[in-house]
Design a protein with these regions (language model features):
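Acidic/histidine-rich alpha-helical segments that form the ligand environment
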Residues: 78-115, 130-135
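Hydrophobic alpha-helical core bundles mediating ligand binding, dimerization, or RNAP-core interactions
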Residues: 12, 16-19, 23, 94, ...
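Short secondary-structure junctions
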Residues: 25-27, 109
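Short, contiguous alpha-helical
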Residues: 9-13, 20, 28-77, 117-160
Length: 160
């Protein structure tokens, strides 16, 4: 495995640990509380990060889908809380997607990582590897939001 791919794998693993610490101990009834009317609740942020993590799985040749995934794509407006999947479903999805991603990353070939991606798709350098790097950065951004929401809900820091 190349150094770049090993670093990316380690970053996704570390993000997975941060996710666990950030969401640990928050009761399901608090996952739908918004810090303000214009912001997303924890369930939306976590599900969005999971759906985006699944993009990485698909780039690496894997599969994952859920009937609710379109509720959490970029730019989607919040819907009535009753339309969202349960906290348990979202956590199960995160765990399943994470297993698939962390299994697929070490087997990614240099040829796959160097393949160009469609113009306009987010990528650090226009390649599949660059898109995976962008997705990891994107995920880290949302982990920060999760940490803020955690603290705002009164559960203290997830890290540190």
């Amino acid at each position: 495995m190349s150094t770049d791919l090993q670093t990316l794998t380690n970053q996704f693993k570390f993000n997975n640990e941060i996710y666990g610490r950030t969401t640990q101990g928050i009761p399901p009834e608090q996952w739908l509380i918004q810090p303000c009317q214009e912001s997303n609740h924890l369930l939306w942020v976590v599900a969005h990060a999971a759906v985006t993590r699944a993009v990485a799985v698909r780039l690496l040749g894997g599969k994952w889908s859920a009937p609710w995934q379109s509720l959490f794509t970029r730019g989607q407006q919040r819907v009535d809380n009753g339309r969202y999947p349960s906290v348990a479903e979202v956590q199960q999805a995160w765990n399943e997607i994470s297993r698939r991603l962390l299994s697929a990353l070490p087997t990614a070939s240099p040829e796959l990582m160097g393949q160009p991606v469609e113009k306009g798709k987010p990528s650090i350098d226009g390649t599949v590897g660059g898109t995976l790097g962008f997705l990891c950065l994107h995920e880290s951004y949302h982990l920060g939001q999760m940490g803020f929401i955690r603290k705002w809900l009164g559960h203290g820091q997830g890290l540190g």
